[in-house]
Curated annotation (Swiss-Prot):
It comes from the Bacteria. HAMAP family: Ribosomal_uL13. One of its GO terms (molecular function) is mRNA binding. One of its GO terms (biological process) is negative regulation of translation. Keywords: Ribonucleoprotein, Ribosomal protein. It comes from Methylococcus capsulatus (strain ATCC 33009 / NCIMB 11132 / Bath). GO terms for cellular component: cytosolic large ribosomal subunit. This is Large ribosomal subunit protein uL13. InterPro entries: Ribosomal_uL13, Ribosomal_uL13_bac-type, Ribosomal_uL13_CS, Ribosomal_uL13_sf. Belongs to the universal ribosomal protein uL13 family. PANTHER family: LARGE RIBOSOMAL SUBUNIT PROTEIN UL13M, RIBOSOMAL PROTEIN L13. Part of the 50S ribosomal subunit. Transmembrane segments: none annotated.
Length: 142
């Protein structure tokens, strides 16, 4: 019996919508990253993008435990000397809540061109509405 290897043209991708309201950030992000990679499918192949599309709604209502709302700091560097920017999770939730889930999931995906292709299949929205009704996403309970 030969080892099965999925071909990019033969991969069937489904659309799922996930409601992040009241869900813990890490547990939610782990399952989203797993589905973006395609590890939940029997035809998973490490070097082929076999994952599904994930639409996340209510990103502003995702839950974190402990004092992470004030203690967790996100850092970025602009590339200029002395321009290290930092923002707490609480302030980031007020400004761009979708970035919280995007950052968590991006850190769980491979750091290569395949990981970037997987990340492009993630669509995150702060509120309850999204613009992907035409794809008829199925609800996914995590």
């Amino acid at each position: 019996m030969k080892t099965f290897s999925a071909k990019p043209a033969e991969v069937k991708r489904d659309w799922y919508v996930v409601d992040a309201e009241g869900k813990t950030l890490g547990r939610l992000s782990t399952e989203i990253a797993r589905r973006l990679r395609g590890k939940h499918k029997p035809e998973y192949t490490p070097h082929v993008d076999t994952g599904d599309y994930i639409v996340v709604v209510n990103a502003e209502k995702v839950r974190v435990t402990g004092n992470k709302e004030q203690d967790k700091i996100y850092y970025k560097h602009t590339g200029y000397i002395g321009n290290m920017k930092s923002i707490s999770l609480g302030k980031l939730r007020d400004r761009r809540p979708e970035l919280i889930i995007e950052t968590a999931v991006k850190g769980m995906l491979p750091k290569n061109p395949l990981g970037r292709a997987m990340f492009r299949k993630l669509k995150v929205y702060a509120g309850p509405s999204h613009q992907h009704q035409a794809q008829q996403p199925k609800p996914l309970e995590i």
